Amino acid sequence: MRIIGIDPGLARVGYGIIDEIEGKKIMIDCGIIETKSTQKEEERLVEISNDLSSIIKKWNPNSAAVEKFFFYRSSTTISVVQARGVIMMTLGKYKLPIQEFPPMQIKLAVTGYGHSDKNDVLNSVMHELNVTSPPKPDDAADALAIALTGIYLK
């Protein structure tokens, strides 16, 4: 099984690719899709879709896991929701089964405690994937946690 985890955003979209082979989880790749604040919003959304398409074509995941939000209050959050919609559309274009998880469920799945802090999540991700240095930037590490949640809760 190969899964892509995605941490949605407009400025930075984190992604993480993990293989699960006979119960062992192996980090294949992680990183970010970054857009510039000087671009028009529609240009940023197109860039996210195009870059995500390239990542999907390169790594050919079997499924996807995406962070899900419940509250939309600020204009910044609305932009993130728009980016998330583009991400969902792009995943759908490749017919990837999509799992969606709220932040508390991701923390619970990865650390065993739904109110864990970022360091606890990061340490759990590093331990599970047997990596010695933290995945950078934080958005990529978060995406790996989302991918692990997709594996644990499949």
Curated annotation (Swiss-Prot):
The record's cofactor note says:
Binds 2 Mg(2+) ion per subunit.
> Into which EC class is this enzyme placed?
hydrolase
Where on the tree of life does the source sit, at the highest rank? Answer: Bacteria
* GO biological process terms on file: DNA recombination; DNA repair
Its cellular-component GO annotations read: cytoplasm; Holliday junction resolvase complex
Q: Name one GO molecular function term.
A: crossover junction DNA endonuclease activity
- Which keywords describe this protein according to UniProt? Cytoplasm, DNA damage, DNA recombination, DNA repair, DNA-binding, Endonuclease, Hydrolase, Magnesium, Metal-binding, Nuclease
Compartments where found? Cytoplasm
Indicate whether Magnesium appears among the record's keywords: yes
Q: Which reaction does it catalyse?
A: Endonucleolytic cleavage at a junction such as a reciprocal single-stranded crossover between two homologous DNA duplexes (Holliday junction)
- Please name the InterPro entries in this protein's record: RNaseH-like_sf (IPR012337), RNaseH_sf (IPR036397), X-over_junc_endoDNase_RuvC (IPR002176)
Has keyword Transmembrane helix?
no
- The residues listed in the UniProt record as binding Mg(2+) 2, with positions renumbered to this chain, are E67
EC number of this enzyme = 3.1.21.10
Which CDD domains does the protein's record reference? RuvC (cd16962)
For this protein, the record's Gene3D superfamilies field holds: Ribonuclease H-like superfamily/Ribonuclease H (3.30.420.10)
Q: Where is the active site?
A: D7, E67, D139
Pfam families of this UniProt entry? RuvC
Q: List the disulfide bonds.
A: none
Q: Which family does it belong to?
A: Belongs to the RuvC family.
Matches recorded under PANTHER family: CROSSOVER JUNCTION ENDODEOXYRIBONUCLEASE RUVC
Q: What does this protein do?
A: The RuvA-RuvB-RuvC complex processes Holliday junction (HJ) DNA during genetic recombination and DNA repair. Endonuclease that resolves HJ intermediates. Cleaves cruciform DNA by making single-stranded nicks across the HJ at symmetrical positions within the homologous arms, yielding a 5'-phosphate and a 3'-hydroxyl group; requires a central core of homology in the junction. The consensus cleavage sequence is 5'-(A/T)TT(C/G)-3'. Cleavage occurs on the 3'-side of the TT dinucleotide at the point of strand exchange.
Q: How does it assemble?
A: Homodimer which binds Holliday junction (HJ) DNA. The HJ becomes 2-fold symmetrical on binding to RuvC with unstacked arms; it has a different conformation from HJ DNA in complex with RuvA. In the full resolvosome a probable DNA-RuvA(4)-RuvB(12)-RuvC(2) complex forms which resolves the HJ.
What protein am I looking at? Crossover junction endodeoxyribonuclease RuvC
Q: Which organism is it from?
A: Prochlorococcus marinus (strain NATL2A)
**Record lineage:** Bacteria, Bacillati, Cyanobacteriota, Cyanophyceae, Synechococcales
